[in-house]
Amino acid sequence: MGTIVKNVSIVTGQAEAPFIRHGYFKFADGVIVSVAEGTPSPEEIDRVEVIDGKGKWVMPGMINTHGHLGMSLLRGHSDDLPLQSWLTEKMWPFEGKMDREAVHHARQLAMAEMIKSGTTTFLEMYHLYMDDLAEAVVEQGPRAVLMRSMIGLCSESEQREKLKEAVTFATTWNGDGNGRITTMMAPHAPYTCPPSFIEMIVDEADRIDLPLHTHMAETQREVEEHRKTYGVHPLVHFEQLGFLKDRHWLLAHCVHLGEEELDILEQHPSVHVSHNPMSNLKLGSGIANVQSMLERGINICLGTDSVASNNHLDLVEEMRIAALLQKGAVLDPTAIPAETAIAMATKNGAKALRLPQVGTIEAGKRADFIMIDPQCLHLQPHEHVMSHLVYALKGADVQDVFVEGAPLMLNKELKTFDEEKLQFEANAHYQRICEKLK
């Protein structure tokens, strides 16, 4: 048995055959069995479910490698402020009033939004009610990399309690949901975690064999303050303290890196960078030197950050902005070609999240894919599929989304979420929290 998807153009992500103009693929029990050009034979379609793509484009599900879904009620809550003021004056006071119900509905809203624009895997770095999110992921079908993030601006006993919570969460949920949930360890940032606390977290990550995630060099201010306190750039400090060696890290942002810091990243192939261009632009943080990182062989993937600083979770738009921004920043139209941008949104993210089972469409990989109907004005003429996916596509063009071969959206209709209820609950809980702040 199984399912065959026929009459489709396939962006495989494979180096040897990145694009199949007219082809088909088969999956069974959540795994891709075969990918081929042409039309399946009568023998191949005997006793299997057949999905006629009718000319749709298929690509790997997109992978959002940095986000805070729990902040999704904060969309538009505060704009046009520097990062530190934005965090301390607007974000953290609101989050301090959020209860379990508010965080739950924020995440429901975020997961649905991501699925509707083609994201099949997301990373959540947050500190509140993480078990609730893991349960929702198991029930509602996406793939997720989850972590209980830790801020260390507290006593050592409080740090140890946070670390205990993070380890318990990580070890409890890693591999759950038929493998759809994996976990990481996450010191929030060098400016919120003293080196002694990060060392404790790194040691625990080593003990339980999990990768690590943190914010790094997002703003010039945090880099300058770290230099005043410790005498060096935070990434250099990580290197000096031995945090990077032989460890799998995913660093979010990396906007303010000089040649020394780029050299360090190049020397550590297990350290990856999540590029969040739209959040960095909106918060005035700057433009990461992604082109130089790519030229050095550093693995770059994409993240949206939270809707509080973006203000959406559309990786299609993030992919386009990432490509265009580097072309303008380095004055080179060849920077980040379409194929590279697609890789950043798919297989590079899989590598960064230590998920070798996804990111491409090929035999043996999990059946995480999306389908796009090119019958819309802004995708004509539809000859140039790779170009259109980066420079013309909109997230709303995604029609079908599958994870592990299970449909999460068909013909733009969510299968595991009540979209009308999501909108009602989001507004109700936002107003309720605002009343608490008065």
From Swiss-Prot:
| Note on cofactor | Binds 1 zinc ion per subunit.
Q: Say yes or no: keyword Zinc present.
A: yes
What keywords does the record list, in alphabetical order? Answer: Hydrolase, Metal-binding, Zinc
Question: Which EC class, in a word?
Answer: hydrolase
One GO molecular function term of this record is: metal ion binding
Which cofactors are required for activity? Answer: Zn(2+)
Q: Which amino acid positions bind substrate, per UniProt?
A: E95, R148, H188, E218, D305
Quote the catalytic activity from the record. Answer: S-adenosyl-L-homocysteine + H2O + H(+) = S-inosyl-L-homocysteine + NH4(+); S-methyl-5'-thioadenosine + H2O + H(+) = S-methyl-5'-thioinosine + NH4(+)
Q: Which Pfam families match?
A: Amidohydro_1
What EC number(s) are associated with this protein in UniProt?
3.5.4.28, 3.5.4.31
User: Which residues of the sequence carry a binding annotation for Zn(2+)?
Assistant: H66, H68, H215, D305
User: Which family does this protein fall into?
Assistant: Belongs to the metallo-dependent hydrolases superfamily. MTA/SAH deaminase family.
UniProt function note: Catalyzes the deamination of 5-methylthioadenosine and S-adenosyl-L-homocysteine into 5-methylthioinosine and S-inosyl-L-homocysteine, respectively. Is also able to deaminate adenosine.
HAMAP family associated with the record: MTA_SAH_deamin
Q: What is this protein called?
A: 5-methylthioadenosine/S-adenosylhomocysteine deaminase
Q: What does the organism's lineage look like at the top?
A: Bacteria, Bacillati, Bacillota, Bacilli, Bacillales
